């Protein structure tokens, strides 16, 4: 499947540089549920990795030498790349969390892969 990249999405790709990444991020902080097993977090990450990937989360950008940029479908998703686990050492502070977020968000996403990481 080939699908043109809409102008608004294309704008982000064209304006992005290593000095100025244009992707966005969201932060979610979780607490382990009461009475959850010690394997809860590991099981949660494994469940995310095992979930089926549907459009548009399996699209990656293709920029041909001639022609318009388009979305292509990634057939074999590397879920170890897309779903990861990060944490600050306990008890953890807001400052430590911000340092991790800054490090994770500093670089550009790999354009050879669908443009998302859950970490």
How would you label these PLM feature ranges?
Residues 1-119:
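Non-catalytic N-terminal regions of enzymes
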